[in-house]
Amino acid sequence: MSTPTKAVLHLPSAHFIVWETSLPTSEVLARLDFALNKDGATEFMSHVHRDMKTQQELVDGIHSVVNGRAGLVFFSTIPLHKLTTFRTGNPNPPHIAVYSFGNPLYAQRVIKHNPIAAANIPPRMVIIENENRDGTRIGYNLPSSIMMDPFGKEDEELKADLLSLDKKIEAMVLGIIRA
């Protein structure tokens, strides 16, 4: 019989980024769907697991889905605002959606250097309609603050990949709220 052990890893402090815009949530969601190629990427991950056999097939598949957009791929969305309807009885609560997105090529590189980071892959983003519906908040954990090696091992390649991912996500968000 094995004896389980538990370790509490003190990660560097996570940085949660929140952007605010006066854009309607429906517009933010439409732009995010476009940036992540939601229509083209919806079946992508099942195709990865079911049909792809080589790294080159994965690379080609990602490039075909990304197709010059944000460099990130849509995976899923969870409409959490619907849960508040049950609790409040409000049939039309402010919109809250959590998006999962990413790029499997980034994921491969990050996991190579820090397998524990897989707990935070794919990245997630929350889109929240303001209570008075006069704008939208977009929030996400900064990848470089939650995916570095928790044992303190500095890896320059991992750090560079995560800082690049930070910039890629920020550029996507700014493209959405400034467009």
Predicted ranges, named:
Residues 2-179:
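Feature detects long, helix-prone N-terminal segments enriched in hydrophobes
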